[in-house]
Amino acid sequence: MKIAVLGAGAWGTALAVNAARAAGAGVTRHQVTLWARNAAQVQALQAERANTRYLPGIALPASLLLQGGGEASLGQAVSGQDLIILATPVSAARSMLTQLKHAAVPVAWLSKGFEAAVFAEPASASLAKPFGLMVHEVRAQVAPDLRAGVFSGPSFALEVARGQPTALVAASEHAEVREALVAAFHGASLRVYASDDMVGVEVGGAVKNVMAIAAGLCDGLQLGLNARAALITRGLAEITRLGVALGARAETFTGLSGLGDLVLTATGDLSRNRKVGLLLAQGKTLAEVLESLGHVAEGVYCARTVVQRAASLGVDMPIAQSVVALLDGKLKASEAVALLMEREPKTELDCY
């Protein structure tokens, strides 16, 4: 299979490396092209045969093709491919999907989060609000005929690049897209499950970042394992409520893109979003936290959008609201915890 991975950050590079190495045990070797927008980055990747900025210590397979440097090179990178993987940040999804809208092969994205704003006329009145959109909603606006999907789940890029066992979910309303993702990536170190609930898979992947900030805060304040378990469980309830209100199936959130991704991001030491909470608990300002990270922490940028969309749908999300207040400097860490603990008693499973 010929696969183009567009975006040479940590996750795009990791997936390209994994696919290029895949062979044996019934898995055929793929021809994989990794594309980067920046020509200088491509030159560095070619010279070093490694992505030293995002995945130091991981060698790029000799078979991995490298391209990049602009729209012309993008056209070359996707020409003749069987599958296109969009591994760019959410902020670039609209531009990339617009350029790929006439693609004749399946396109799947790895992005987890929301756009900062609505940049074009919405495809339906339900989207005519000043809220950022998830990538499947952007696709509905700019590339409605594209056979598309989302590839998500509990996964740190470094572990995928190392070939450590990982399970992901390929979600699309098109069976062809699901089958292409399974054929491309299911193998010795990646187990790929299929789903037709794109909305649920995207909501889980996006909103868990906000909950991971809260989990980091919990750990940073040394509130204990009981508190962490409670926060993860109630965070999942909030994610599920929002997802169902947006059209997802509740059971999707018990799977890899819901519970799985939340547990990993809320507890893993490689989680940038969890680190945000840890540093805020130490008394650092948000500006100091972002400067120290060096990479994107999507939870910081999508927290307000999550709360806005929840409010527009009448969905109660107190943990997400507390995270926004904390990021805005309106609450101290200890105050956020106190507010959550002082809420009125409720029935546990009266969620959706």
Curated annotation (Swiss-Prot):
Pathway: Membrane lipid metabolism; glycerophospholipid metabolism. Keywords: Cytoplasm, Lipid biosynthesis, Lipid metabolism, NAD, NADP, Nucleotide-binding, Oxidoreductase, Phospholipid biosynthesis, Phospholipid metabolism. It is found in: Cytoplasm. The keyword Lyase does not apply. GO terms for biological process: carbohydrate metabolic process; glycerol-3-phosphate biosynthetic process; glycerol-3-phosphate catabolic process; glycerophospholipid metabolic process; phospholipid biosynthetic process. Its main location: cytoplasm. The active site is at residue 208. InterPro entries: 6-PGluconate_DH-like_C_sf, 6PGD_dom2, G3P_DH_NAD-dep, G3P_DH_NAD-dep_C, G3P_DH_NAD-dep_N, NAD(P)-bd_dom_sf. It catalyses: sn-glycerol 3-phosphate + NAD(+) = dihydroxyacetone phosphate + NADH + H(+); sn-glycerol 3-phosphate + NADP(+) = dihydroxyacetone phosphate + NADPH + H(+). It holds the Pfam family NAD_Gly3P_dh_C. It comes from the Bacteria. NADPH binds at residues 11, 37, 112, 157, 272, 296, 298. One of its GO terms (cellular component) is cytosol. Its EC number is 1.1.1.94. Catalyzes the reduction of the glycolytic intermediate dihydroxyacetone phosphate (DHAP) to sn-glycerol 3-phosphate (G3P), the key precursor for phospholipid synthesis. Belongs to the NAD-dependent glycerol-3-phosphate dehydrogenase family. This is Glycerol-3-phosphate dehydrogenase [NAD(P)+]. It comes from Polaromonas naphthalenivorans (strain CJ2).
